[in-house]
Amino acid sequence: MSLGDLGFHTVSLSGPATLYELAEIRESLLAAIAVGKDLRIDLETTGPWDLAGLQLMISATASGRRAGQAVRLVNVPRVCAEIAERSGLSNWLSSVTDTFL
């Protein structure tokens, strides 16, 4: 994890974002939210994805919002965007994403 620009704390995730990895990813995201700064989640080196991974991103943004923090996604992989599209969540994903791959 590193401090990003514009006052955001940036956490870079890598590897699979599926049901089997959620506990570890969730703990990383909760720790990042606990820093107390707006959060940028870099997803460039993540994959494969499943719906559980997308649900975790929804949960992270909601947790940040409850804590008064902005949570933004960057470098969202195409496969994640495709899952959002199939799930009817494209508009939500676009609303929290700064960049797609």
PLM region descriptions:
Residues 1-52, 58-101:
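STAS-like cytosolic regulatory interaction modules
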